[in-house]
Amino acid sequence: VPLGVPVALGVPPSRPPCRPVNVTVAAEKDECPQCLAVTTTACGGYCRTREPVYRSPLGGPAQQACGYGALRYERLALPGCAPGADPTVAVPVALSCRCARCPMATADCTVAGLGPAFCGAPAGFGPQ
């Protein structure tokens, strides 16, 4: 790394550090026949990890994942919901992100998932 070029949190310059990034997600509910594509911010980027040469019988070091530091929720209404059904959904918006152990009770830190734009509603995204 040239002098004067900082390396954020030990992450090489070729890999962006953990930060809020724009994403498009599919908002859906069981009572509504179609999804709504929503642009929001989520946390993405790399966190410094270490793999020791020596394997301790006490276990390995805690690996960190990029997750929410602070967030707020935006409420949106889905189109075409059944009469009497609540059409509103809450979409998280990342205000800040941080590297920490994955909170397995509230987050999905798997290698690959369905993806944020997956829509399981019968009518999909409806007419565009």
UniProtKB/Swiss-Prot annotation:
CDD domains: GHB_like (cd00069). GO terms for biological process: estradiol secretion; G protein-coupled receptor signaling pathway. Its main location: secreted. It is found in: Secreted. Keywords: Disulfide bond, Glycoprotein, Hormone, Secreted. SUPFAM superfamilies: Cystine-knot cytokines. Pfam families: Cys_knot. Glycans are attached at residue 22. Disulfide bonds join 18-66, 32-81, 35-119, 43-97, 47-99, 102-109. Gene3D superfamilies: Cystine-knot cytokines (2.10.90.10). InterPro entries: Cystine-knot_cytokine, Glyco_hormone_CN, Gonadotropin_bsu, Gonadotropin_bsu_CS. It comes from the Eukaryota. Heterodimer of a common alpha chain and a unique beta chain which confers biological specificity to thyrotropin, lutropin, follitropin and gonadotropin. Belongs to the glycoprotein hormones subunit beta family. Promotes spermatogenesis and ovulation by stimulating the testes and ovaries to synthesize steroids. This is Lutropin subunit beta. It comes from Struthio camelus (Common ostrich).
